[in-house]
């Protein structure tokens, strides 16, 4: 196998965006290949048994790193487990691999080898996430905010107000999607953005001038705007009942004086960083367990590939023998009018064996023992 890759470790996101592969053109040009592209990763996987012109591939992917053989296979298994992701153990990459593989299969661009490899990688990614805690705990600020709210207040059947529909608000929204929330309300100065995010969350969008009513209705408030001024001041929160407010904005959205209310618990981005850092450390501690799974499954994969190779060799050899049989049989049929059956069968069997041994000897004379053991000599002997 051959992998060409470019990712966030080497290139900034704007550069990666310019390096993205035109998948329509890619799949028109190559066979036995799969492209996996995310916002911070571009990778193409090639079955080199089919794509033998490696130089052509390398010329097309100037600037990409190149991995081959065992190194390429281990890399892909690590990618599927989230071990190569910007956020260690993240779940999204596994779904992206599945989608990319499905597209290549629908286009009939995979091979028996790539089918086995991708199915194994998906299985390994699933094992890593079910048998270890590599994907547990919020490590982004957005997911940490949701985790904090759930831990301190519980989110099941709660009403959550999200103030801000920008980048940070969207991160929170993605984390909220996994929870059994009663209702989600999204408010933003640009109402259309609130509407779009609310639709994704199957929630409700409210205009900014209706914020007071939304606060009264909510149990948990998450603030994530880019405003240079406070969105919520102390006077805005008189008589609103018990609330948890999580302020992940920078600069802050909520006046610290809000802490004076006994019925309101205010958490800031500093509290979330502590949670995020602890969760990252927990994930790092799971790395050896994931690597053990990868090593185990790699050995299983190698046995599967060896079996596939043997089956392909036997198939090719049978075709080679059948080709000789047909040719020698045609000669025997032509002789059937002038010679007796016993003589014809004798000549046929000798010619059949002689042709096979001749091809083998011709190829093996100038071939090392190691190369001979690893070769399909009958292809070269023709």
Curated annotation (Swiss-Prot):
Oxidoreductase is among the record's keywords: yes
Hey, where's the site called Important for activity on this chain?
A: 75
For the protein in the UniProt heading, the enzyme class is oxidoreductase
In Pfam terms, one family for this protein is: GlutR_N
Q: Which residues form the active site?
A: 39 (nucleophile)
Key word Metal-binding present: no
Q: Determine the domain of life of the protein's source.
A: Archaea
Positions annotated to bind NADP(+):
164-169
**Note on file?**
During catalysis, the active site Cys acts as a nucleophile attacking the alpha-carbonyl group of tRNA-bound glutamate with the formation of a thioester intermediate between enzyme and glutamate, and the concomitant release of tRNA(Glu). The thioester intermediate is finally reduced by direct hydride transfer from NADPH, to form the product GSA.
The record's HAMAP family line, in alphabetical order, gives: Glu_tRNA_reductase
Q: What is this protein called?
A: Glutamyl-tRNA reductase
Organism classification, top ranks? Answer: Archaea, Methanobacteriati, Methanobacteriota, Methanomada group, Methanococci
Name of the encoding gene: hemA
